[in-house]
Amino acid sequence: MLLRVNPAAVVAVTAVVVTVAGCSTTVSGSAHRAHPAVPDPHRSYGYVDDRCGLLLDGSIREAVGADHIARPYSGAVCQYMLSRGPDGDAEAPPTTIDITFSWFETGSFDRERALAAERGAVVTDTVVERHEAFLARRDTTGAACSATAAAGTGVLSWWVQFRGQPGGDPCEDAEMLLSATLRSDL
């Protein structure tokens, strides 16, 4: 007795065998998290229209709860000096806050992260407004922290220091300013 085999069935069985054999390959190594491209590869964060990091001086003052703000320098790097009154203690002196914004148009996120670690900062990876970012806490002459993100064609940072004050959380203010910059629309 002869068995009749359908040619379509032979092709189907052969395709399944080839597919299973091809999909059973073992790959060595370890998994690494994908690094997505920045969400805004062509956006500029430079100094324009008397704004640093796309933010007006008044919005920076409000964001950190300061009473006064002065910007002694503007350009690729913008420097601010702010003062914030004491919280509930009329006898305490006001807190002086130093803030620096920088945007390096062709900067490298990995380079900035390596430099922060090399200089002794405690580096914490995070994501801010869909951008790969890190916080770098380094208290030398007061509580200080920078929030840095890959953005546009480069990297931008907000650095906040509570001058002469060992306590407080400058990372909260730095991350808030970074978030405001990344959300800003011109």
List where the protein language model places each region:
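Bacterial N-terminal signal peptides that target proteins for export
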Residues: 1-13
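C-terminal motif of bacterial Sec signal peptides marking the signal peptidase cleavage site
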Residues: 18-22
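Bacterial signal peptide processing site
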Residues: 24-27
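Short, solvent-exposed recognition patches
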Residues: 65-136
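A short, solvent-exposed beta-edge/loop patch
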Residues: 117-186
